[in-house]
């Protein structure tokens, strides 16, 4: 019996129970009100719910009385072994062994689809992440967003959302000016400009620009030279960024140029729309947006008195452009230095008549520190002053790098110790999880060699405590995925597969799939092979959601 099966049956029972009572019609019952949770003490059953306490007040009866009626009806379900009412009205549910064990068959038959849901079915989501300007290799903070953002996109898609991965960048701003001046200075053998970019990559890009230029670049004026380095240098740097991200397993559907906002008229349309809504005013020759109406600490200049657009004008045009493209939900991932950006963005959303936190969410990520044996890693020789994606991948590989960046909440500072990630021991979390998958595959190979197959399935035989614990965790996977999608927290999936791996290793040490010596193959062995393969599938599904491979051998 799967969690959705039990939840659906419980909802029907609750609806009937409420409907038989005065005031029952006044309760707006919905399936999402019925929540099943794992009891902390497994002696209290497989599942628990507090639904009786949630509906007791409008029904005018005690929670325990309502819980008793619900428990009686639940106890009549053939898959339920026992139902108890505890405390003020908790309902504890114990499933029949066969009903609990049947999940293994369901998972194997479902394959990659197990864990997927429908909570975001049909919703169009724009997920903007990384969005670094092409002035150098991606630093470790951007790499964190690459791993977290791609994982979040996978999880949102697993819940049915139509997700567009988007990368926003400006190839004509002041950072690009500094980048172009740095390239030109490198070519001319001059000192790096005071506000320029250093590192060996500047010389490499400058050389490639010169090699690719058709003609004598030194015959150009300095201004013309700088324009060549600006255009070709940013194209080369951005091409490198795209390739490095692709090699890291991160690809984007849309690369959005800031300039296109002005060229397409999106900024003008946004200002016109906000003017119609009465939120724009003129003062001191400038055009302002009255964001204080919506909780911002001050009103914001949109068009300066010089006629030049202020920074927020691009935000206005970009948000309107996304809404015009049909995105109901927009998620932006930003670094810790953008914390002050949130208030004005949410005020902007409200000024458009939308709902902050629904139509726009902003996720703020914290710093990443790279260590080796507890000591800070030296900066990249190529990038000069930052630790880059290449540094991480060269040290530990794509899988370990991605997993390390995803397994912790993005709003917390993160220390990654390369020495730990290089170990083939249980101290290394990615090894621990991948080894669990490889072990399930080894069990399959050994089972085949010993004549154990899945020709029989007797779930009532899966009664060992480690089997009950393992089945309980397997039941949790769809809920974990849905929760990770709702809360925008991919680390929940990573932590779940770690817990599942630990439970599997304990089961492996206690329960044999392959018979010893001359021992005959029994239905218990065959049924345990189903359970082994169910774990293999769920570990693979979980790792796929965070963009990490599931090796068959290690």
Swiss-Prot record:
<dbReference type="Pfam" id="PF00750">
    <property type="entry name" value="tRNA-synt_1d"/>
</dbReference>
<dbReference type="InterPro" id="IPR001412">
    <property type="entry name" value="aa-tRNA-synth_I_CS"/>
</dbReference>
<dbReference type="InterPro" id="IPR035684">
    <property type="entry name" value="ArgRS_core"/>
</dbReference>
<dbReference type="InterPro" id="IPR001278">
    <property type="entry name" value="Arg-tRNA-ligase"/>
</dbReference>
<dbReference type="InterPro" id="IPR014729">
    <property type="entry name" value="Rossmann-like_a/b/a_fold"/>
</dbReference>
<dbReference type="GO" id="GO:0004814">
    <property type="term" value="F:arginine-tRNA ligase activity"/>
</dbReference>
<protein>
    <recommendedName>
        <fullName>Arginine--tRNA ligase</fullName>
        <ecNumber>6.1.1.19</ecNumber>
    </recommendedName>
</protein>
<keyword id="KW-0963">Cytoplasm</keyword>
<keyword id="KW-0547">Nucleotide-binding</keyword>
<keyword id="KW-0436">Ligase</keyword>
<dbReference type="Pfam" id="PF03485">
    <property type="entry name" value="Arg_tRNA_synt_N"/>
</dbReference>
<dbReference type="InterPro" id="IPR005148">
    <property type="entry name" value="Arg-tRNA-synth_N"/>
</dbReference>
<dbReference type="Pfam" id="PF05746">
    <property type="entry name" value="DALR_1"/>
</dbReference>
<dbReference type="InterPro" id="IPR036695">
    <property type="entry name" value="Arg-tRNA-synth_N_sf"/>
</dbReference>
<dbReference type="GO" id="GO:0006420">
    <property type="term" value="P:arginyl-tRNA aminoacylation"/>
</dbReference>
<comment type="similarity">
    <text>Belongs to the class-I aminoacyl-tRNA synthetase family.</text>
</comment>
<keyword id="KW-0648">Protein biosynthesis</keyword>
<dbReference type="InterPro" id="IPR009080">
    <property type="entry name" value="tRNAsynth_Ia_anticodon-bd"/>
</dbReference>
<dbReference type="GO" id="GO:0005524">
    <property type="term" value="F:ATP binding"/>
</dbReference>
<feature type="short sequence motif" description="'HIGH' region">
    <location>
        <begin position="132"/>
        <end position="142"/>
    </location>
</feature>
<dbReference type="GO" id="GO:0005737">
    <property type="term" value="C:cytoplasm"/>
</dbReference>
<keyword id="KW-0067">ATP-binding</keyword>
<keyword id="KW-0030">Aminoacyl-tRNA synthetase</keyword>
<comment type="subunit">
    <text>Monomer.</text>
</comment>
<dbReference type="InterPro" id="IPR008909">
    <property type="entry name" value="DALR_anticod-bd"/>
</dbReference>
């Amino acid at each position: 019996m799967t969690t959705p099966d039990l939840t659906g049956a419980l909802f029907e029972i609750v609806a009937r129970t409420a409907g038989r009572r005065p005031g029952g019609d006044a309760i707006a019952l919905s399936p999402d009100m019925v929540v099943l949770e794992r009891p902390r003490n497994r002696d209290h059953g497989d599942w628990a719910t507090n639904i009786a306490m949630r509906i007791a007040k409008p029904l005018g009866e005690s929670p325990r009385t309502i819980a008793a009626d619900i428990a009686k009806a639940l106890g009549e379900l053939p898959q339920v072994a026992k139902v108890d009412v505890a405390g003020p009205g908790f309902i504890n549910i114990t499933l029949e062994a066969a009903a609990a064990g049947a999940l293994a068959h369901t998972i194997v038959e479902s394959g990659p689809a197990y864990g997927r849901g429908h909570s975001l079915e049909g919703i169009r989501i724009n997920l903007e992440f990384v969005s670094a300007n092409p002035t150098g290799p991606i630093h470790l903070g951007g790499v964190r967003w690459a791993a977290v953002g791609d994982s979040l996109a996978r999880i949102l898609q697993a819940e049915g959302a139509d997700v567009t991965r988007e990368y926003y960048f400006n190839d004509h701003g002041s950072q690009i000016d500094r980048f172009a001046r740095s390239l030109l200075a490198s070519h001319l053998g001059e000192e790096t400009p005071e506000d320029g970019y250093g590192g060996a990559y500047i010389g490499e890009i400058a050389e490639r620009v010169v090699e690719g230029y058709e003609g004598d670049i030194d015959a150009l004026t300095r201004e013309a030279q700088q324009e060549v380095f600006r255009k070709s240098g940013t194209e080369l740097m951005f091409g490198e960024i795209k390739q490095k991200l692709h090699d890291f397993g991160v690809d984007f559907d849309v690369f959005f140029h800031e300039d296109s906002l002005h060229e397409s008229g999106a900024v003008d349309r946004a200002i016109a729309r906000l003017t119609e809504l009465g939120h724009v005013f003129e003062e001191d020759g400038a055009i302002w947006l009255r964001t204080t109406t919506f909780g911002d600490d001050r009103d914001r200049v949109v068009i300066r008195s010089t006629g030049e657009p202020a920074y927020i004008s691009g935000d206005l045009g970009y948000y309107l452009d996304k809404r015009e493209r049909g995105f109901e939900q927009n998620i932006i991932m930003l670094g810790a230095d953008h914390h002050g950006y949130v208030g004005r963005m949410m005020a902007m959303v409200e000024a458009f008549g939308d709902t902050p936190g629904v139509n726009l969410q902003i996720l703020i990520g914290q710093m990443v520190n790279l260590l080796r044996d507890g000591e800070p890693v030296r900066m990249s020789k190529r990038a000069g002053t930052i630790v880059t994606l290449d540094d991480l991948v060269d040290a530990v590989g794509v899988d370990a790098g991605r997993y390390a960046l995803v397994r912790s909440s993005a709003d917390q500072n993160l220390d990654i110790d390369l020495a730990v990630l290089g170990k083939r021991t249980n101290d290394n979390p990615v090894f621990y999880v991948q080894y669990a998958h490889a072990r399930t595959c080894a069990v399959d190979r050994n089972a085949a060699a010993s004549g154990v197959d899945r020709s029989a399935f007797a779930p009532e035989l899966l009664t060992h405590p480690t089997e009950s614990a393992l089945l309980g965790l397997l039941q949790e996977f769809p809920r974990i995925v849905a929760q990770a999608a709702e809360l925008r927290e991919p680390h929940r999936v990573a932590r779940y597969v770690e817990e599942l791996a630990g439970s599997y290793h304990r089961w492996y040490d206690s329960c044999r799939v392959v018979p010893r010596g001359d021992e005959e193959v029994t239905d218990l062995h065959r049924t345990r092979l189903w359970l082994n393969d169910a774990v293999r599938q769920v570990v693979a599904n979980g790792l796929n959601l965070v963009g990490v491979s599931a090796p068959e051998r290690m």
